[in-house]
Amino acid sequence: MTQQVKQALAAYDVVREKFGDAVSAFDSNETMPFFEVLDTDQWPDIALFMRDHPKLKFNYMACLSGVDYPQEEKLGIVCNLESVAALGHRVAVKVRCSRDGGSIPSVACVWHTANWHEREAYDMFGMLFSGHPDLRRILCPEDWEGFPLRKDYKVQETYHGIKVPY
């Protein structure tokens, strides 16, 4: 077990002790060790706990990526969190919601970097973030049809009378 995995597992244990079954089992089989938040409503509380707890200090959200799970009819996010200046460890946290009208609570008030990342996940996947301060498109025009990174996305033929070349 690498030092990175040991540190991530220790961080997971602190979160699991506080939140119990709201989080899944720890997994280190991917590039970055991760766990999943199973109780989506607790995501902001878990995020705040991870940022502020003295043994965790995850003070930096390096990335928040949207994911489409069409076979499960779910959308999700993967947040790469780091304790930059304090402890030097990192972990990924996954959160999923229903593909059809589900939402994930925003953590833009916990990590300011989440603001634009959540907007991008909304723009590309149609993922809703409840409580987001400014949830609107960030890359596509406001009147763009659909969400380009969903696996079932069909490119519109024209946009304002201009042929879309794909």
UniProtKB/Swiss-Prot annotation:
Please state what class of enzyme this protein is. translocase
Q: Which GO terms describe its cellular component?
A: plasma membrane
Similarity remark: Belongs to the complex I 30 kDa subunit family.
Q: What is its EC number?
A: 7.1.1.-
Q: Does the keyword S-adenosyl-L-methionine apply?
A: no
Any Pfam family? Complex1_30kDa
Role description: NDH-1 shuttles electrons from NADH, via FMN and iron-sulfur (Fe-S) centers, to quinones in the respiratory chain. The immediate electron acceptor for the enzyme in this species is believed to be a menaquinone. Couples the redox reaction to proton translocation (for every two electrons transferred, four hydrogen ions are translocated across the cytoplasmic membrane), and thus conserves the redox energy in a proton gradient.
Membrane topology field: Peripheral membrane protein
* Organism domain of life: Bacteria
What's the protein called, per UniProt? NADH-quinone oxidoreductase subunit C
Taxonomic classification, please?
Bacteria, Pseudomonadati, Chlorobiota, Chlorobiia, Chlorobiales
Using the chain's own numbering, where are the disulfide bonds?
none
Q: Which organism is it from?
A: Chlorobium phaeobacteroides (strain DSM 266 / SMG 266 / 2430)
Catalytic activity of the protein: a quinone + NADH + 5 H(+)(in) = a quinol + NAD(+) + 4 H(+)(out)
